[in-house]
């Protein structure tokens, strides 16, 4: 969330319609302007599943510890469905059980991300590449492992399971069971993880009782004075880009791979805010305990350093405004898809 620079674009145009904006400076938007703004957040239809059999196979693999070197760690260990497909630990653990330097990222809505790269630092160009890296390094994509991984051993485990052999033959006829096809199945499943329908969605669709008056004020702040929409606009609440928001860290994020771009140093990918209230602590390293503390971080503008996003400027909010923003973010918690979450 949160930058104070207001880009020229659809949302800004909506806010300014009828002498509305900035919203926080000139009061509540007109009904017409608010209605137009809400349309920008209307969720599209769920993506069609290209190969349901492959996605079902990927779901089985996602919950199976056979994919780890130790045989005890599954993808779900860092991506719990009931917590918005992350865990509540500030940082994830690798296959050896040791803490890494980063928190797991939510997996919801990734099928809508198009060509956007995957991970806090965008190292993986596709979900397939991310799945392969997680298995091959034993690090759950964190680049931090002390357990050697022999991919052929993991492939052999799957090949020796008659159930998996039958499922692979059905999903990918005539294809061998390899790291590539395992990753293909995992990615197919992950693309089916749509954000659950939330109270916010019901409000957007016309149910005025779905969210509180405080949350409605928070939505206006989100798209006005607090300017959170600059990075978190749209129904998925992410721009899929990388920003240094001034979090105290030695982790260079995107800058580890993009060394010649100053703004990419200490920059991390904007996470979706869907079901955000389920997954404290926040930021790439789990260093911010609560949504309220997130508000305070953005008010201060973060650490001043050359890479800090020019959108990060100090902001003064009242206590009620902070509470309204938190109330709004809490309306983004979606229902769990039991069919995909069931082990």
Question: What do these predicted regions represent?
Answer:
Residues 2-7, 21-343:
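Periplasmic c-type cytochrome electron-transfer domains
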Residues 8-18:
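Bacterial N-terminal signal peptides
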């Amino acid at each position: 969330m949160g930058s104070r620079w207001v880009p020229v674009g659809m949302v800004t145009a909506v806010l300014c319609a009828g002498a509305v904006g900035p919203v926080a400076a000139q009061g509540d938007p007109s009904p017409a302007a608010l209605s137009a703004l809400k349309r920008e957040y209307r969720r599209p239809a769920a993506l069609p599943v290209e190969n349901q059999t492959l996605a079902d196979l990927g779901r089985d693999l996602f919950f199976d510890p056979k994919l780890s070197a130790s045989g005890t760690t599954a993808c779900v260990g860092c991506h719990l469905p009931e917590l918005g497909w992350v865990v509540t630990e500030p940082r994830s653990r690798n296959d050896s059980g040791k803490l890494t330097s980063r928190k797991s990222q939510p997996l919801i809505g990734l099928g809508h991300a198009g060509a956007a790269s995957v991970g806090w630092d965008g190292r993986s160009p596709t979900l397939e590449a991310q799945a392969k890296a997680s298995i091959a390094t034993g690090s759950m994509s964190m680049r931090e492992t002390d357990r050697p991984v022999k991919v052929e051993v993991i492939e052999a485990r799957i090949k020796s399971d008659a159930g998996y052999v039958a499922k692979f033959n059905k999903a990918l006829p005539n294809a061998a069971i390899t790291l590539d096809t395992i990753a293909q199945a995992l990615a197919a499943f992950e693309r089916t993880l749509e954000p659950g329908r939330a109270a916010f969605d019901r409000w957007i669709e016309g149910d005025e009782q779905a969210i509180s008056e405080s949350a409605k004020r928070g939505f206006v702040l989100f798209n006005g004075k607090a300017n959170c929409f600059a990075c978190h606009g749209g129904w998925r609440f992410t721009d899929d880009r990388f920003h240094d928001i001034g979090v105290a860290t030695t982790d260079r994020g995107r800058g580890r791979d993009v060394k010649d771009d100053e703004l990419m140093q200490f920059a991390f990918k904007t996470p979706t805010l869907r079901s955000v209230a389920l997954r404290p602590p926040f930021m790439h390293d789990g260093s911010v305990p609560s949504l309220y503390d997130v508000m305070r971080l953005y008010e201060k503008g973060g650490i001043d350093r050359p890479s800090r996003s020019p959108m990060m400027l100090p902001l003064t909010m009242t206590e009620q405004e902070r509470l309204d923003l938190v109330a709004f973010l809490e309306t983004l918690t979606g229902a769990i898809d039991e069919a995909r979450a069931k082990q």
